[in-house]
Amino acid sequence: MSKTVDLLGQQAEYYLNHTCKTIDKKLIHVPGPDVIDKIWVDSDRNVRTLNSLQALYGHGRLANTGYVSILPVDQDIEHTAGASFAPNPIYFDPENIVKLAIEGGCNAVASTFGILGAVARKYAHKIPFVVKLNHNELLTYPNSYDQVMFGTCLLYTSDAADDRISV
């Protein structure tokens, strides 16, 4: 903590002992081990979604605190792999991305369907996966910022466990 105080300098007291007086504490959902029961259970989310959320909140170094740390890696698709991974070429390999998330104690790893699909058999039971479906198509000129869905997966909507959308 002393390093933090040193970094904050003269403003350490202000930042570390700040009490908000503009928003009533009762209006805030404070993270905690019961976040699924307090926030999500009464929502319209289906049972599988609630189960997946509990797996996510219950995994990694922040397990059951109500906080999450997710390693998001989709740079190789959206922003070219050369620009993103050239300094660390081992991350061209999807397995190393997942290993990094596990070693870092992340609650989950988020990436594209292809990246996660390539390593799912080996790692899906070791860390929750979050599939990112929102990708811009930046391969053409001029750039198109339309969201392009690609890959093949099955999504369950929050309306009912039986509703399925094939992407």
Predicted regions and their residues:
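Conserved, well-structured core domains of diverse proteins
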Residues: M1-W40
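Active-site loops and adjacent core secondary-structure elements that bind or stabilize anionic groups
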Residues: V5-H18, L50-N51, A55-H59, P94, ...
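Conserved, mostly hydrophobic/aromatic
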Residues: L71
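Active-site mouth loops of central-metabolism enzymes
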Residues: Q75-F92, K132-Q147
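Short, acidic/polar
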Residues: F92-K99, Y145-L155
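Alpha-helix-loop-beta-strand connector modules within alpha/beta enzyme cores
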Residues: A120-E137
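Single conserved hydrophobic/aromatic residue that forms the stacking wall/gate
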Residues: Y156-V167
